[in-house]
């Protein structure tokens, strides 16, 4: 354990780096406001005294627009129906929620949308009757691939008046793919003849059409869903109201923070302008990177926080919300603690069935590669996603290799003999700073594309060598100390 004064120094330095770099982004946003407004049409509203808003983050704008139109009211309807069903018809609550989910899906996606979800679900259920994991996965991948066929896309576009409706269908089918895959694989693992009626088609529909997670997740495995949905214990009305009030308070704070960032820092518009990105100062470049990943974090606190709140009111335990990215210091931690539901899905249904760590080094490398290949394809399979997946695979592989090396008895004895616990902690943070730099780079590729990643690589690691590179690693060294201390506290709690 490091001295308190040293940890406090690292924390203050980290906060100082954050705020100063954000200030640099704010200045650049103001200086180039007219230029960015002409190119990207910044929005004007009265939320923050008339400040213009960067609305170029498609995902945030998309879900906020749908939320105002339909989703907030449909989610409120789910909450009311669920509470009424719990009070009046508890035994039939899963089927009532299933019917409500179908109706809500019909409200926003129409008959063709509901039919597509039903079609994919039915095909997956029929294939699962063969009790073959291989056939189930081939079926799921085939259904997923149909979402990217140009001819199929054109047909689906003709069903709707706006692009937003088409994209909502695409997002819904993409997330539903993980849900019907989870059910089908769980069915494959049941011994014949299946004694439980939990793996019937009605339960599959109740799982797939559970509305809070229908369009965007988070991911909850069927085994967890069925176990929790069948339990009879539920919170009292008073406890539910407390959960609702606290949850809404947190959601409003997260939403306000995300909107404030979009009004003060035009990071998404600047990322879309590569010539401008190549000319800003290194401080601004660092602030843009921090602002981008932190906005992504706050955005998913909202997007996952809303369904998580409704799941708690329904008596379900949702996956944990993302942990703050400023406390992440490894690829492994990022995957484990950001999208917990997706991580659990990948481990349970991809990594372990392929072989996991039970087949030696090559088996581990292959299982990890297959996991990242699937998650890249599931996200869309674009070039920048394969690059992002490769960087993550390499990062996780190197981290696990270093961890195994350090855990060997010979290295352990040498470290214990020649280095104090404080020195070992500092050495850990130094290694973590290198990993964190690559983690941020991979996240920027995911959020901004290959061109943004290349710009950062050239400016920080090629043109900026040695002083800019070493300065960045020094800043990340402070971040890593904070992250390591946070991780230890998190593990203790």
From Swiss-Prot:
Membrane topology classification: Multi-pass membrane protein
Membrane topology (Lumenal): 23-67, 149-162, 272-281, 381-383, 449-462
Region entry Essential for palmitoylation of SHH, spans: 91-155
Record annotation: effect of changing residue 287 to V: In NNMS; loss of palmitoyltransferase activity; unable to carry out SHH and DHH palmitoylation; does not affect HHAT protein levels
Ranges in the topological domain labelled Cytoplasmic: 1-5, 85-94, 120-131, 184-202, 218-243, 311-363, 400-427, 482-493
Description of pH dependence: Optimum pH is 6.5.
EC numbers, comma separated: 2.3.1.-
Enzymatic class: transferase
Location relative to the cell: Endoplasmic reticulum membrane; Golgi apparatus membrane
Name of the protein in question: Protein-cysteine N-palmitoyltransferase HHAT
Lineage: Eukaryota, Metazoa, Chordata, Craniata, Vertebrata
Gene name in the database record: HHAT
